[in-house]
């Protein structure tokens, strides 16, 4: 099937762990048998000694030499992501499959060639710590490598369980792990939220997979990328990291046609600084064409549209097998007084490749605090006094004094699963009541999208265990099913005769550099000053002190 469909098959020997001469001797007959049985297939391109090895490097090199002598027509590698945190170039290999490389400056730093969790116990990829936008690539990371570099097991974004699957697991495949997670969700009062959590986390995972793949395609001379898999992995702590479930069925987060916009033989790409913009400024994007199809393309054009603006750029002839620049697009964004979402759409003629990118445009002006409303960063005596007198308080987090017990902020879903790597936030994105009037001036879907990139990264989710079980936040932070904590990012409560709106973001500080933070604060202030602000859940001040200050 791979021969007929044009797949390149990278085969690995069945080993993961510490390498010794005895292991090399045991695996040699397996490798030789693979070459004899499958070596006549044109799809069989690469043979690797296995996955994430440590140990005797000389033994690895010796086995590669032995296998190459038997069949010199293959490409060979001593393993995929060998030596994990401290990888180094292996002699005699034909490519370097890794998540990170030594920096070219001779320091002891390492630089990533995947977007998230290049070291799984540390959130250090550009999807966690980067500037946002779509300009990041890995050309600096691969510059010093004499071999083609292939990024290893990109993605691995955890999603929330879909408990309806439990009934489909029978016999020895009974999903006791999912049953345990379901019981935890029920005990935490989160069972009714499970379907929404599954949809929102899967949608975010699809966004992140797209950026992972496009960053690889944006890198000139890159050797390629490997996804760990498209389906969930039910073992090793339960890693629900697939766009498909364990039955290879879609979770509904992305369609095949949408996936092929950014993962196909030819892909249109746009590089721009950020997804969030101030009204009236000039948007600039550099367009490129990643073309790895079988044939060259004759000259054509790229047609684009953004809101009410549209145009085209000439597209030169494109030889297959590389990344081709197409030119720069410049467009003045609407001078709107109300936040809006736009979509940059691109079409390449004659290939027919299309792609689209969401952008958000926000008013430049700050919204003053309405009269009679108190904006604060602490639930202190002054806030309590205002509420006791029937007043209205909006409380934003203070970046300098995090809420107690908060898992911290993060845009991407958890890596692999929290039960294995626990010194990261471990959350799975946002579940948003997008139609709530508090967000009337802040366009959003029910899941995290790129306008939440900087906000989610700076978030202080509030643990809600001390607050009433009936409290449903306007925006929830989805916790992993192992920890199963109720977490709120924005929620409203009644405190005596007063009204309180809590936001786990330091919006006043974030607004200095991020227009989306200014717009979100404006939307919250407008709502809190309106008659629509009528919280129903009563909370005692002492419970709020516990939740917000420990």
Could you tell me what each predicted segment is?
Residues 1-245:
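Substrate-binding/catalytic cleft of secreted carbohydrate-active enzymes
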Residues 18-20, 56-59, 86-87, 395-396, ...:
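Extracytoplasmic/secreted cell-surface and envelope-processing proteins
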Residues 66, 70, 228-293, 302:
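Aromatic-rich peripheral "rim/lid" segments of glycoside hydrolase catalytic domains that contact
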Residues 122-136, 402, 419-515, 532-550:
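Catalytic beta-strand/loop cores that center a nucleophilic Ser/Cys/Thr
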Residues 280-316, 326-333, 338-349:
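Beta-strand-rich binding/interaction modules
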Residues 349-355:
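Short, exposed coil/turn segments at beta-strand boundaries within extracellular/luminal domains
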Residues 360-378:
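Low-complexity, Pro/Ser/Thr- and charge-rich linker/hinge segments at domain boundaries
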Residues 372-419, 497, 503, 524:
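Short alpha-beta junction capping motif
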């Amino acid at each position: 099937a791979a021969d007929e469909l044009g797949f390149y098959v990278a085969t690995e020997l069945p080993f993961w762990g510490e390498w010794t001469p005895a292991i090399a001797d045991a695996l040699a007959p397996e490798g030789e048998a693979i070459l004899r049985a499958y070596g006549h297939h044109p799809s069989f391109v690469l043979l690797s000694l296995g996955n994430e090895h440590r140990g005797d490097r000389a033994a690895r090199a010796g086995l590669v030499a032995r296998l190459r002598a038997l069949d010199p027509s293959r490409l060979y590698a001593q393993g995929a992501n060998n030596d994990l945190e401290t990888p180094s170039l292996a002699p005699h290999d034909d490519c370097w499959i890794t998540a990170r490389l030594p920096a070219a400056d001779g320091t002891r730093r390492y630089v990533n060639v995947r977007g998230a969790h290049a070291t799984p116990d540390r959130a250090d990829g550009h999807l966690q710590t980067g500037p946002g936008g779509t300009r990041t690539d890995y050309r600096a990371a691969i510059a010093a490598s004499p071999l083609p570099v292939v990024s290893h097991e990109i993605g691995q974004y955890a999603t929330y369980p879909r408990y309806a699957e439990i009934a489909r697991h029978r016999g020895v495949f009974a999903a006791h792990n999912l049953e345990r997670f379901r019981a935890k969700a029920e005990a935490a009062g989160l069972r009714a939220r499970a379907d929404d959590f599954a949809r929102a986390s899967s949608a975010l995972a699809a966004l992140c997979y797209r950026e992972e793949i496009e960053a690889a395609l944006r890198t000139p001379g890159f050797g390629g990328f490997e996804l760990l898999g498209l389906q969930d992995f039910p073992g090793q702590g339960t890693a629900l990291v697939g766009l498909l479930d364990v039955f290879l069925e879609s979770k509904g987060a992305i369609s095949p046609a949408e996936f092929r916009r950014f993962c196909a033989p030819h892909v249109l790409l746009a590089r721009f600084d950020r997804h969030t913009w101030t009204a009236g400024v000039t948007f600039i994007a550099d367009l490129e064409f990643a073309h790895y199809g079988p044939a060259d393309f004759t000259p054509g054009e790229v047609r684009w549209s953004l809101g009410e603006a549209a145009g085209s750029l000439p597209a030169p002839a494109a030889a297959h097998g590389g990344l081709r620049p197409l030119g720069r697009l410049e467009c003045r964004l609407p001078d709107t007084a109300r936040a809006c979402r736009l979509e940059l759409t691109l079409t390449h003629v004659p290939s027919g490749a299309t792609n689209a990118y969401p952008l958000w445009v926000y008013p430049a002006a700050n919204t003053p605090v309405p009269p009679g409303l108190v904006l604060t960063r602490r639930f202190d005596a002054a806030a309590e006094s205002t509420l006791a007198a029937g007043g209205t308080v909006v409380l934003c987090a203070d970046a300098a004094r995090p809420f107690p017990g908060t898992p911290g902020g993060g845009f991407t879903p958890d890596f692999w699963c929290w039960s294995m790597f626990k010194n990261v936030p471990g959350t799975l994105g946002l579940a948003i009541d997008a139609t709530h009037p508090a967000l009337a001036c802040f366009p959003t879907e029910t899941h995290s999208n790129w306008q939440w990139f900087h906000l989610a990264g700076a978030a202080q989710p509030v643990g809600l265990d001390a607050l009433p079980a009936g409290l449903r936040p306007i925006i929830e932070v989805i916790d992993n099913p192992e920890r199963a904590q109720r977490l709120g990012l924005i929620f409203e409560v009644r405190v005596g005769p007063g009204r309180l709106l809590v936001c786990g973001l330091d919006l006043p500080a974030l607004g200095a550099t991020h227009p989306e933070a200014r717009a979100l604060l404006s939307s919250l202030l407008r709502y809190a000053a309106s008659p629509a602000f009528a919280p129903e859940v009563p909370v005692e001040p002492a419970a709020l002190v516990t939740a917000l200050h420990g």
